[in-house]
């Protein structure tokens, strides 16, 4: 007849299944005596009696060597996963997050995963700058879309002063002015072409003010259209490049750009402004 242990009933009442095969534990007890009830239940000679009501069922542990009953000995339990301590900087944040119950459930059983991802993002961007947008933020300010450049205030003032006294420039004068303002001859020529187009438009809108300016500005310099024309005595055959007829033949679109007297399209074939009427 097989002897029934009195401690088997509480084990079955706790809902612990009896395994068909009992593996051998890693650690052996000091004095294995499988015929005593104390050894079967894992109680020592001075151990306190087990409580009648437990708050929660304990996890299943390794059984004893020669019995089919589950053992409740704590030293036989080996932890499967031991979480890494969380960094102190994230401990208060994670405590507040998981304390509210927003991430309650078996899917979020390891809170350290969220802290690891957050810490990885901080290590990736230590300075807090947008790494992906840096090539688009750092753009040159002196150039504009379409290859246009903007004249500085000093260059514009000098060009305006020259235009007040002289509406057309000869090639030597244009070269000298471009060297003085650190511009190309093409930019100076383009600026004067567009400035003359604007001047003609203002002349058509307000002819009285234009006549007054011509009387004051061109009184000492004479007719600007005779600038650069060869003298009859010289007999030269060279034709001025900045004369009104030559400018209209070389640059027929110079009258189109009226208002853009500070932006030059250096990429274009003729070098004129991109104007908006």
Curated annotation (Swiss-Prot):
Q: What residues are annotated to bind DNA?
A: 144-203
Chief localization: nucleus
Q: Where in the cell is it found?
A: Nucleus
Keywords from the UniProt entry? Developmental protein, Differentiation, DNA-binding, Homeobox, Nucleus, Repressor, Transcription, Transcription regulation
The Gene Ontology CC terms held by the record are: nucleus
Q: Which GO terms describe its molecular function?
A: DNA-binding transcription factor activity, RNA polymerase II-specific; RNA polymerase II cis-regulatory region sequence-specific DNA binding; sequence-specific DNA binding
State the function annotated in the UniProt record. Recognizes the DNA sequence 5'-ATTAA-3'. Transcriptional repressor. May play a role in hematopoietic differentiation.
Indicate what this protein is called per its UniProt record. Answer: Hematopoietically-expressed homeobox protein HHEX
What organism does this protein naturally occur in?
Answer: Gallus gallus
